[in-house]
């Protein structure tokens, strides 16, 4: 897939689990009044932010459900929403081919049109305050052998040229606690990254600049 990255465009990428790449069309990409100036771009490594910026930022929300049969197949259920998408004439959310099925657009607002095209969601005329929700089956649970499993999510980024704008990510993972035990979450909780754990459920909330990738490790009981 071709993604413009010249001046006036911006690029948001996701990895295997959210597996989405959001490529905004070039024309008028920086005309949104809520779009931050280039001075706000962070060119350094991952940096967690202890508070949200004053202006609304892109909020990416993933809800993953691991079922008992996911351990054999690797397929998990994904519900995904995006709030405060940047205003652009066109964009697409693209999933890794062969790792997504049953992709659907469930709801959208402040977007003229949204439709499925292959393994992607195509967007047209994204306005300020846009919201998009979709669902799919994602092949994202990896069996690493000897009863261990990894769920890798990301990298998330809100990229502009060679730097990054602030982004908010919420990740919820539900898993069968009767057959899986949570071993570890990377990165660990810290200012700007909150993690809540209970048997069968994980909740993560991050505000950051840069590229964020998470890994959740399980052991089969």
Enumerate the predicted regions with their spans.
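Bacterial N-terminal signal peptides that target proteins for export
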Residues: 2-16
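Beta-strand-rich interaction surfaces with strong enrichment in secreted/lumenal proteins
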Residues: 64-69, 81-82, 120-126, 157-159, ...
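Bacterial N-terminal signal peptides
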Residues: 14-25
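Short, well-ordered beta-strand segments enriched in hydrophobic/aromatic residues
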Residues: 76-84
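Solvent-exposed beta-hairpin/edge-strand motifs
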Residues: 41-43, 87-117, 161-192, 197
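N-terminal, polar/Ser/Thr-rich
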Residues: 30-69, 161
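A surface-exposed beta-strand-loop module
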Residues: 104-151, 198-212, 216-221
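Surface-exposed, acidic/Ser/Thr-rich flexible loop segments
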Residues: 119-191
């Amino acid at each position: 897939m071709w993604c413009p990255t010249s001046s006036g465009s911006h690029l948001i990428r996701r990895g295997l689990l959210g597996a989405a790449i959001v490529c905004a069309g070039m024309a008028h990409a920086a005309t949104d009044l809520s779009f931050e100036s280039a001075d706000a771009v962070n060119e350094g490594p991952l940096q967690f932010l202890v508070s949200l910026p004053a202006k609304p930022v892109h909020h990416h929300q993933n809800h993953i459900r691991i079922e008992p049969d996911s351990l054999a197949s690797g397929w998990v259920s994904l519900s995904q929403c995006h709030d405060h998408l940047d205003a652009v004439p066109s964009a697409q959310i693209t999933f890794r081919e062969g790792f997504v099925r049953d992709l659907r657009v469930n709801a959208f607002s402040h977007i003229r049109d949204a439709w499925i095209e292959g393994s992607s969601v195509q967007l047209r005329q994204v306005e300020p305050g846009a919201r998009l929700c979709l669902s799919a089956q994602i092949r994202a649970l990896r069996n690493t052998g000897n009863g261990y499993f990894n769920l890798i999510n990301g990298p998330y980024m809100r990229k502009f040229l060679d730097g990054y704008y602030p982004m908010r990510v919420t990740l919820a993972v539900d898993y069968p606690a009767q057959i899986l035990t949570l071993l570890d979450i990377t990165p660990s909780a810290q200012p700007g990254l909150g993690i809540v754990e209970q048997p069968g459920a994980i909740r993560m909330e991050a505000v950051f600049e840069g590229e964020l990738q998470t890994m959740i490790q399980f052991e089969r009981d």
